[in-house]
A protein has these predicted regions:
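The feature captures the beta-strand-to-loop junction immediately N-terminal to the Walker
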Residues: 40-41
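A short, flexible loop at the N-terminus of ABC-type nucleotide-binding domains that lies
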Residues: 1-4, 13-26, 57-62, 75-80, ...
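Charged, flexible cofactor/metal-binding loops and thiol motifs
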Residues: 77-82, 249-355
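A short, proline-enriched helix->beta-strand linker immediately N-terminal to the Walker B motif
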Residues: 180-184
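Conserved ABC ATPase signature
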Residues: 160-165, 169
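Conserved ABC ATPase "signature" region
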Residues: 136-156, 265
Length: 355
């Protein structure tokens, strides 16, 4: 299988008046053709910031301060990969990639779709930008995409506005928009969170069918472990801007190594727990704001098995425990992460960070 995307030591920081907020703090991973990588973690762990970094849509005052995001050409594997971090976030080069080679499905379609434009015009926009300049051809492709995602009366739907559609249909429209140019990578940022359970199952099944048909890769972001169990091949667990554990779906779900991953798994409802009368276990405390945190394991303050004098004084290195199962925890070794100096932001005349 060919590599589609490789992220190397990515760091995305927000320079605020309170200090430097490390939303993404040195993560690395790869996605192969046709694979699904699930990224899980609580809110505030950096999942969405990592995906925004890939598309170079990090909102101000955020800034990519280090690392590489390498996008490989699937049609010409012999070509050198493009480093997206070196592109102007507002430039023509990255605009050719957004919606073309990389697409994204957002969490809430009602706030992502324009209320002023018809469904047809919004799907056609990406097609006209990346595929063809012929409006009739673009409209026909938009129609075909609505058929592909299972929307009834597609001709009529093309002329309707988002507020006229149900939540499930709106999310199918978002999927149609994202896949209209046949991207090699689809980023799905909690696309089923706002949907009821029945519609959620339908959308997940639809995405799996389309992935099999189109051969694309998916980066799926969610805090719902049940969803990840349905769609992912590999899983990365994020906490406080770092990947603390990564491996195959079976490795993460059957043999979680990091205390944070273990606590997440124990919080999943199951019929067995209900039958045995066991209560769901929760994780004490909340995810801290990643500003001014001294060098330490980010989970140390909430960890029931932390080593005093070690976990609260140094950052564990992400190491391979065998068969590609990576974990960042002092329970499995004493390797420490190298310290990194925080880059100073470039300032414009009016004192704001550059985008």
């Amino acid at each position: 299988m060919n590599k589609v995307l490789e992220v190397r030591d990515l760091r995305t920081y927000y320079y605020t008046y309170e200090g430097v907020l490390k939303a993404v703090d040195g993560i690395s991973y790869s996605i192969m053709q046709g694979q699904t990588l699930g990224i899980i973690g609580e809110s505030g762990c950096g999942k969405s910031a990592s995906s925004q970094s890939i598309l170079r849509i990090v909102p101000s005052p955020g800034k990519i301060v280090g690392g590489q995001i390498l996008l490989y050409d699937q049609e010409h594997p012999e070509k050198e990969p493009q480093d997206l971090t070196q592109m102007d976030p507002r430039g023509k080069e990255i605009r050719k990639i957004r919606g073309g080679r990389i697409s994204m499905i957002f969490q809430e379609p009602m706030t992502s779709l324009s209320p002023l434009h018809t469904v047809g015009n919004q799907i056609m926009e990406a097609i006209l930008l990346h595929q063809t300049k012929d409006r009739k051809e673009a409209e026909e492709r938009a129609y075909e995409m609505l058929v592909k995602v299972g929307i009834g009366n597609p001709r009529e739907r093309l002329q309707e506005y988002p507020h006229q559609l149900s939540g499930g249909i709106r999310q199918r429209v978002m999927i149609a928009m994202a896949l209209s140019c046949h991207p090699s990578l689809l980023i799905a940022d909690e696309p089923t969170t706002a949907l009821d359970v029945t519609v959620q199952a339908q959308v997940l099944e639809l995405m799996k069918e389309l992935q099999s048909e189109l051969g694309m890769s998916i980066q799926y972001i969610t805090h719902d472990l049940g969803v990840i169990g349905e769609v992912a091949d590999y899983v990365a667990v994020m906490y406080l801007g770092k990947i603390v554990e990564m491996g195959s779906l079976e490795q993460i779900f059957r043999n979680p190594l990091h205390p944070y991953t273990d606590r997440l798994m124990k919080s999943i409802p199951s019929l067995r727990k209900r039958k045995d009368g066991r209560k769901l276990e929760s994780i004490s405390g909340t995810v801290p704001i990643p500003i001014g945190i001294p060098p330490s394991c980010g989970f140390a303050g909430r960890c029931p098995v932390r080593k005093s004098g070690k976990c609260d004084c140094a950052v564990p290195k992400l190491t391979d425990r065998g068969d590609g199962h990576l974990v960042s925890c002092f329970l499995y070794g004493d390797e420490e992460e190298d310290s990194v100096e925080i880059p100073k932001p470039k300032r414009k005349k009016w004192g704001r960070s550059e985008g």
